[in-house]
Amino acid sequence: MSLIVIGLNHKTAPVEIREKIAFNSKEAIKEALKELIQREGIGEVVIISTCNRVEIYVYTANVSDLKRENQVEETIKAFLSNFHNIEIGEFENYLYVYKDTEAVEHLFKVASSLDSMIVGEPQITGQVKESYEIALSERTTSLILNYLMNRALFTAKRVRNETRIGENPVSVSYAAVGLIKKVFDELSKKSILLVGAGEMAELALRHLIGSGIKNVYLTNRTFQRAEEIAKEFNGVAVPFGNLKEQLVKTDIVICSTGAPHYVITEQMLKEVMPLRKHKPIFFIDISVPRNVDPACNELDNVYLYNIDDLQDVVDSNILERKKEAEKALSIVQEETEKFFQWLNSLESVPVIVSIRNKAEQVRQEEIEKFKAKYKDLPPELINSIDYLTQSIINKIMHSPTVALKNNCENKEILIFSARRLFGLDSEEE
């Protein structure tokens, strides 16, 4: 058996590759999970897909040698190629593969926001939880990944509570605002249009209002959703069909939609710029896939930054949180060890259950013999004897149970010896 994670993220792959591999909806993830769980060697599977990463976590079924583990890896690569209609050669070199201890430690880092573009941003924990819930709904997890994902979320909670890594919350949206503030001195005099009413757009809006912005416009394909957020933040909702007209009178545009295509095209801006007398317009595209055609950046007075361009802002946050990240890493390592203690204890569970079942069987048989011999005993005394014998069994079984659960170098010999000592092998024969 083996735990494997195969993926790519903002550190290993540019946005052009990530957007080709991303699963852009819950339905896409569900479809992918259904396909993967049918593949040979895959016993359990969870997919995490965000703006900055795509990762597939697998608990392999009946795979105990390196050759077959490699076959599972190739199976996943082939699946990604077929599902996204992209040649393996286009993305293979950007992938990372972690197994067993490294895989568990990596997941715990991801859930705790230690592997994020901005260390400490809280959104990833919720995204990991949602990814797990989708896998649960599709029944592609069982004992191992259920426990692993729950421990990942528990680890993230420990990191959040036991370190200061979450102080002054940051996110990709916050980094976008930081970039805007470097360019414009007085945000209160500028107008901003948010294209998209999802989580990322709302986060950006909160940060902008906190920075003094007042002239906020918001457009979304679902106008009702745009109105709801605009009302909450004293902004103005703009019908999506009026996007081009709104660009004429906007200084800054932040795009964060789930559209699989360009929402703002080069041709659109060629028509818009003369109408705004070629005044500079500033775009930040934090969508994956990208919503603003990269060709727009070639137009005069159009300044376009995508999610990868936020790295400079991100770096300053990483430096500030480095000390807290070191504390968090010690928590991750501690929880990784605990996970494998639990995993290793599973080897002895069948033996422990068999020993306890045998002890209980003997106890019940002896009580029945006792009751048959002393038929006139009051029920209260029988109940006391039943309780007493249960207590004796539990006390006798405590030390063997602890010994079998604990990790040790010769655990296989210990399990073998326990089976022989308690006569389990002879019963099965």
UniProtKB/Swiss-Prot annotation:
EC code(s) of this entry: 1.2.1.70
One Gene Ontology molecular-function label: glutamyl-tRNA reductase activity
Pathway: Porphyrin-containing compound metabolism; protoporphyrin-IX biosynthesis; 5-aminolevulinate from L-glutamyl-tRNA(Glu): step 1/2
CDD domains: NAD_bind_Glutamyl_tRNA_reduct
Active-site feature positions: 51 (nucleophile)
Site (Important for activity): residue numbering on this chain: 106
Catalytic activity: (S)-4-amino-5-oxopentanoate + tRNA(Glu) + NADP(+) = L-glutamyl-tRNA(Glu) + NADPH + H(+)
GO process annotations (BP): protoporphyrinogen IX biosynthetic process
Residues annotated to bind NADP(+): 196-201
Residues that coordinate or bind substrate: 50-53, 116, 121-123, 127
Keywords: NADP, Oxidoreductase, Porphyrin biosynthesis
Note on domains (UniProt): Possesses an unusual extended V-shaped dimeric structure with each monomer consisting of three distinct domains arranged along a curved 'spinal' alpha-helix. The N-terminal catalytic domain specifically recognizes the glutamate moiety of the substrate. The second domain is the NADPH-binding domain, and the third C-terminal domain is responsible for dimerization.
Annotated function: Catalyzes the NADPH-dependent reduction of glutamyl-tRNA(Glu) to glutamate 1-semialdehyde (GSA).
Self-association state and partner proteins as the record states: Homodimer.
Family: Belongs to the glutamyl-tRNA reductase family.
Additional record remark: During catalysis, the active site Cys acts as a nucleophile attacking the alpha-carbonyl group of tRNA-bound glutamate with the formation of a thioester intermediate between enzyme and glutamate, and the concomitant release of tRNA(Glu). The thioester intermediate is finally reduced by direct hydride transfer from NADPH, to form the product GSA.
Protein name: Glutamyl-tRNA reductase
Lineage: Bacteria, Pseudomonadati, Nitrospirota, Thermodesulfovibrionia, Thermodesulfovibrionales
